[in-house]
Amino acid sequence: KNVYPDLKKDFIEKGLVKIEFRHFPLDIAAFNASKIGQCNNDGKSKIMHILYSGQKKWAKGKTPEEAKANLKKFLVDEGVNLDFEKCIANKAIEDYVLNDRIEGVKKFKVNATPTIIINGKKFEKALNYKNLKKYLEKLI
């Protein structure tokens, strides 16, 4: 959230860097949000931006049912048009999200979010724009 705006301006918009998002849900609220993001993501949709920018509104709940209800209400309030229950229940999407998470652990030893992988290697420095920019400039 704090790194992305500068990264986008200085690297992505100039075609120097490409972002590839992978799901790594750490709890049921994030798992459901990942399924919604994958279900409604046509590559042009702003669903991931909506989910990330409103994370504090939906990423809560003492029970799985409460977490699901919070996410559903958030999406309605944001005007996101989708079949919520169908997306949440979609087994293929569920498998896709879980496989992203499994690959993150096995291939890159991911244990937290956010984690940055650059050219197949985990970025191990403190995640701030100064460190990331310096690292990327060495690669370009």
Roles of regions detected by a PLM:
Residues K1-Y4, K8, K73-I140:
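C-terminal cap of thioredoxin/glutaredoxin-like
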Residues K1-V76:
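Structural alpha/beta surface segment adjacent to cysteine/selenocysteine redox centers
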